[in-house]
Amino acid sequence: MEVEDLGQHISRRFNEDLESVRSAVLKMGGLVEAQFDNAIKSLAEGDSELGLQVAQDDYKINRLEVNIDEQCSRILATRAPTASDLRLIIAIIKAITDLERIGDEAERIGVLSSRLAGVERPSTNYRELRNLASHVQLMLRQTLDAFARLDAAEALKVVKADDVVDEEYESIYRQGITFMMEDPRTISRAMDTTWVARSLERIGDHCKNICEYVLFMVYGKDIRHTQLENIEAEFAPGGKARERGS
């Protein structure tokens, strides 16, 4: 085989490896989204069996995380990627950890939903919980879209939306405390509702993390622990950041 042909062969195999691992991440993301949607459906409809099924299916996400991690390790060991390819592999390794943790939180919501099934819930508190769940569902959908398309603008939307989710969680937490103080009989129910809200808030955090990795892939800049106003100044349309292709 000629040297030039060998180089093209190696390059083609490398691209196939990258596409394979990228496809596996998208498959994992789809499974995580399905698990989360089922957990929220269980909560909304009081479906105890569906909530427990979410918990039972969490192992599928864990298995995918291990497989993708092994794929990435092989690529790092055998292909020695550089520049944008290296950023992609690093971001994938980090992103699958956050996806797995979203799966864990979906499992937790499923278990809590099964406990809350058939239990009377305070209308105001539960309405806010459903609003929070809807916002986090949108965040997760936008996160997966941003990752699939390497869409920096969509990723920035998610980073900004996390502050709203945090505020909604704090409101639900304060209401839960109020309910427990006013009527000690509601303590168990209020605690479970608050833990669901806490899991939703954590899922929002993991979505934000993944979108920060998207910005890292596109621009080559690590924005963790950076103030939101500085992120917007850097990455919003007309900002200072420029895409890095190498």
Regions of interest found by a model, annotated:
Residues M1-S246:
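Cytosolic, long alpha-helical scaffolding segments
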